[in-house]
Amino acid sequence: LARIIKDAPNIEVVVKANHTGTSKHRYFGMGKSHVRKTHPYYAGMEIKDMEPYPEPIVRFDWRNPFWEPDTHKMLADEVMCDAQADYYIDVKEARKTAAMTFSVLSDFLAEKDIVIYDLCLFISEDGKTVYGEISPDCGRYRHYDLGSLDKDVWRAGGSSDQVLEKWNLLYKMITQ
């Protein structure tokens, strides 16, 4: 099943199951905070670095170019509030699609002892179609015994060969 995505939104949809990546590095002190006491399900639960959130969350990022064209300053994608993201993508539908995709992939990978910490998706403007790749470059995948199977190998100082080795290992694990 395939279709051409016309006018793809400049939005990356991120599903976060663990307090890692952007959330860990940008939100000072969040890694030692607690869920509000009046929360109906998770009152007082501690948020810890590298640990699971009470449940996966979906957020929307504006995709910046890697370099600012005039100043050549390195840019990062920026987190958007739902109301702003909804100008470009059907947030309600995209949230459902992202959560369903994450759930299906999590169930599949759990059979291989792999946990998804987070996943970045490209979803159509109507919020109903995931397009583009789902790869080790757009998520954080951890094996119970083998550790990181994604781009964090490189971020931790690993060589290109080590990254390819982990990615090939992930490929073998999910195709056999």
Show the residue positions of the predicted features:
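Acidic/polar, glycine-anchored loop/turn motif associated with catalytic or activation segments
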Residues: 1-118, 125-176
